[in-house]
Amino acid sequence: MNNYQKFLKLHGNDFPFLLGNIWDVQSANMFAAAGYKAIGTSSHAIAAANGYADGEQIPFETILRIAKQVTETVSIPFTLDLEAGYSGHTDGIIQNIEKLNGVGVVGINIEDTVPAAQRELTDAATFAEKVTTITDYARKKGIQVFINIRTDAFLLGIPDALEQTISRIKKYEKTGANGIFVPGIVSKTDIAAVVQSTHLPINVMCMPGLPGFNELGALGVKRISMGGFFYNKVYENAAQLAKSVLNDNNFSSIIH
């Protein structure tokens, strides 16, 4: 079984799997050593770790280089947050996916949000057509990549987020995509409604108020992501250590 097949299978288990969200080779090694079944980039974390703001500000070539380093180092399935695709044209997105798949990436997230200073949802029908073109191409060329559509109504705080999300999912599940990612959703009632609206596996993300993993499993969620929260906590803790060394005038805080 190759990594694509392993990754696909993870989405069919009764209990959701936890995705370790990485930003470099060291973080990838850390999650793999801890026993995680799969890893994936956080767009926020990988951008911040390299000195960029989120929202496709980090160059695609940098992401591709890091992806290659990761797949050469860890053996578990690796998926990548491609944001809106790093291209304004479908052909360009397809080329980017081919390049990533060529270095061993077996999944991508692609979002229905315009990557701009004021983020907003794209037209659902147009976006669905774009994804259909991508999945048709991948199927014809034998490219094994898990396409996870991220839909951002909850993340953007849209008033009718649940209705928007379900309406969009109905269009997106016809595209040939493999899964749906709904970051920002936390209500058990909303999560249950989204899960019940589609046959595709639902992915949720760490947020204040998100139910525990057992509850999410009971609701039918198949995949849980960390987003940038793990990265933020790592560097929050590191900042405290840096202050301790400076204030204590010794290294006791980092050698014990």
Residue ranges and their predicted role:
Residues 2-80, 86-226, 233, 238-240:
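Alpha/beta enzyme core
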